[in-house]
């Protein structure tokens, strides 16, 4: 734990004069008082050794048998008991030095032990990082948080948050807290509702994000706002998403353009990574990739750029081809995509069967491929292609003997997504550097999309973003061709945040919503307070809100977001330690004028 702690100022009182992880040879012969938890206890040839742990690390204690009363007390100590000791620092013998401990050159000969809390048997060990079920870890989270890795994660999170505050304050940002009890909004995920006692039949909602408040702060004349904001969404858990609540670095700025925001956020991330992490950013400034380009090259708007594979468009090569499956996908709105995997053309049939199974899971009818072997091209589609077709394909894709190329054909978006899924699948063939951070900005998202179910034009991303070209674009361009000032920041295949330059002009907002089928009256009914504010002097503004939990998860090398949250819920949105959610008393329900009707089993 010494790596995470690094404290240099000790609070000296009757419990301690020093911290365990900071004792060094210069303190030889010095008297010390230490306090902490019994990490391990060992009996060696009549001597009792105790590893005493505090938040800075471990010191080894020695209890000698000549001190019979002290020795007897030490014998009765259980692991994880809390003790305070007095003793003298001595140097260890050369053969007994422990290079894994910061205090490994010294030990403390104990003269007095005070037991503050004698621990009962533990549900799982702290000293040995044994595999323990997540349910048990969450039920006894206060025990789990003593374990070294997760303890360091929580301390790192605190320091990262403090560093974020310092950086943004130096950039003239103002930290402002926005309300936790607010109004419900039906547009996003499910709200957590809070019944009002003073206003029977009415409800507050916990904020899914401070979106409207931060925009109103721009209208209020605050130039740069930020907040480490708690957000609440009633949605299911994932490895990178905690159910119920999460924290985001909420930011908004007035009088900015898209690149201004990029410069500030990527500058902050580069600073944090360089000063607080051993990880490396592969490219800085972060590359900007349009939505159209990222889908064409990587098949997803959340690409892991560490995977050394790219999708190629081979649609023109199959215009008029005798292979009708591909030829029929050369019309407007469709495409033929290829994914080359170098050096894998001689794999067994099982390799290709597994790949085809994955393609079908992604929604494909099958998986066409060509192996370029010594004896010539092989594969299920070779018989449909002429020698000239194969030669053109080989030259266009730079194929060599030993390579294999996989194909996808059909509607552009679905084909891109299937091939993107296969790119990720084949990414497992490569050893990706976990210390490499490949950030990128995804820009130029479409403003609208066609909703097949509703048979209408709908917003594709954020309805409150400014369309590129503003009113002129809305009045003169086909809706599906209009782009928005919307952007995502992605790292190693994980989306850290979405953001946008906001639409602060009421007439453009009415027009944008009108294209999506909303009347002026509907817009006023849903967003009247925002429209009213924008009519009273609103500056151009934009923002973003990267997930703090996800950023900590990436920098701490964790695959599960619950490893960087002190008291997370489980996958079923339950707090096993506190027993929530729980039933409430009839008196509480009566005060709120509520009656519980459970679903019939």
UniProtKB/Swiss-Prot annotation:
CDD domains membership: AspRS_core, EcAspRS_like_N
Reactions mediated catalytically: tRNA(Asx) + L-aspartate + ATP = L-aspartyl-tRNA(Asx) + AMP + diphosphate
Superkingdom per UniProt: Bacteria
Chief site of localization: cytoplasm
UniProt KW keywords: Aminoacyl-tRNA synthetase, ATP-binding, Cytoplasm, Ligase, Nucleotide-binding, Protein biosynthesis
Keyword match Protein biosynthesis: yes
Binding residues for L-aspartate: 187, 233, 461, 502
Membrane-spanning segments: none
Coiled coil stretches, renumbered: none
Enzyme class: ligase
EC number(s) given by UniProt: 6.1.1.23
Single GO MF descriptor: nucleic acid binding
GO biological process: aspartyl-tRNA aminoacylation
Family: Belongs to the class-II aminoacyl-tRNA synthetase family. Type 1 subfamily.
Subunit structure as annotated in this protein's UniProt entry: Homodimer.
Protein name: Aspartate--tRNA(Asp/Asn) ligase
Taxonomic source organism: Pelodictyon phaeoclathratiforme (strain DSM 5477 / BU-1)
Name of the gene: aspS
């Amino acid at each position: 734990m010494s790596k995470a702690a690094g404290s240099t100022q000790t609070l000296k009182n009757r419990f301690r004069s020093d911290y365990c992880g900071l004792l060094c040879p210069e303190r030889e012969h010095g008297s010390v008082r230490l306090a902490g938890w019994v990490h391990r206890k060992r009996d060696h040839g009549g001597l009792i050794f105790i590893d005493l742990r505090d938040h800075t690390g471990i010191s080894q204690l020695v209890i000698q048998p000549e001190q019979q009363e002290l020795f007897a007390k030490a014998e009765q100590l259980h692991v994880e008991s809390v003790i305070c000791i007095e003793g003298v620092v001595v140097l260890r013998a050369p053969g007994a030095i422990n290079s894994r401990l910061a205090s490994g050159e010294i030990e403390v000969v104990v003269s007095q032990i005070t037991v503050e809390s004698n621990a009962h048997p533990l549900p799982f060990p702290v000293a040995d990082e044994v595999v323990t079920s997540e349910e048990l870890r969450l039920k006894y989270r206060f025990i789990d948080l003593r374990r070294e890795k997760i303890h360091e994660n929580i301390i790192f999170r605190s320091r990262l948050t403090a560093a974020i505050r310092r950086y943004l304050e130096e950039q003239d940002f103002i930290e402002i807290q926005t309300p936790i009890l607010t109004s419900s909004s039906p547009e996003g995920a499910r709200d957590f509702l809070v019944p009002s006692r003073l206003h029977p039949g009415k409800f507050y909602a916990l904020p899914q994000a401070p979106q409207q408040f931060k925009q109103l702060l721009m209208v209020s004349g605050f130039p740069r706002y930020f907040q480490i904001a708690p957000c609440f969404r009633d949605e299911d858990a994932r490895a990178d998403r905690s159910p119920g609540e999460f924290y985001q670095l909420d930011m908004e700025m007035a009088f900015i353009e898209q690149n201004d925001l990029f410069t500030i956020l990527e500058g902050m991330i580069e600073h944090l990574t360089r000063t607080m992490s051993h990880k490396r950013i592969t490219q800085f400034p972060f590359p900007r990739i349009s939505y159209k380009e990222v889908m064409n090259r990587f098949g997803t708007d959340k690409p892991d750029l560490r995977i050394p594979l790219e999708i190629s468009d081979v649609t023109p090569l199959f215009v008029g081809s005798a292979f009708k499956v591909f030829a029929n996908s050369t019309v407007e709105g469709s495409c033929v995509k290829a994914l080359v995997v170098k050096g894998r053309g001689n794999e067994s049939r099982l390799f290709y069967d597994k790949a085809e199974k994955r393609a079908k899971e992604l929604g494909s009818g099958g998986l066409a491929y060509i192996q370029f072997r010594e004896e010539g091209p092989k594969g299920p589609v070779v018989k449909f292609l002429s020698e000239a077709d194969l030669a053109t394909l080989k030259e266009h894709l730079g194929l060599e003997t030993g390579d294999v190329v996989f194909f996808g054909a059909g509607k552009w978006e679905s084909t891109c997504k299937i091939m993107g899924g296969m790119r990720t699948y084949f990414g497992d063939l490569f050893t990706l550097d976990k210390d490499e951070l490949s950030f990128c900005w995804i820009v130029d998202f479409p403003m609208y999309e066609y909703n097949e179910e509703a048979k209408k034009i709908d917003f594709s991303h954020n309805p409150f973003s400014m369309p590129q070209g503003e009113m002129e674009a809305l009045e003169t361009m086909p809706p599906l061709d209009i782009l928005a000032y919307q952007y995502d920041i992605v790292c190693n295949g994980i989306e850290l945040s979405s953001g946008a330059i906001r639409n602060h002009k009421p007439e453009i907002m009415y027009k944008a919503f009108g294209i999506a089928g909303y009347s002026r009256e509907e817009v006023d009914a849903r967003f009247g307070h925002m429209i009213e504010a924008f009519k009273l002097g609103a500056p151009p503004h934009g923002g973003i809100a990267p997930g703090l939990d996800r950023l900590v998860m990436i920098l701490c090398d964790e695959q599960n977001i619950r490893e960087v949250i002190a008291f997370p819920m489980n996958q079923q949105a339950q707090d096993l330690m506190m027993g929530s959610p729980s039933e409430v008393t009839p008196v509480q329900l009566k005060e709120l004028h509520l009656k519980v009707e459970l679903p019939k089993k």
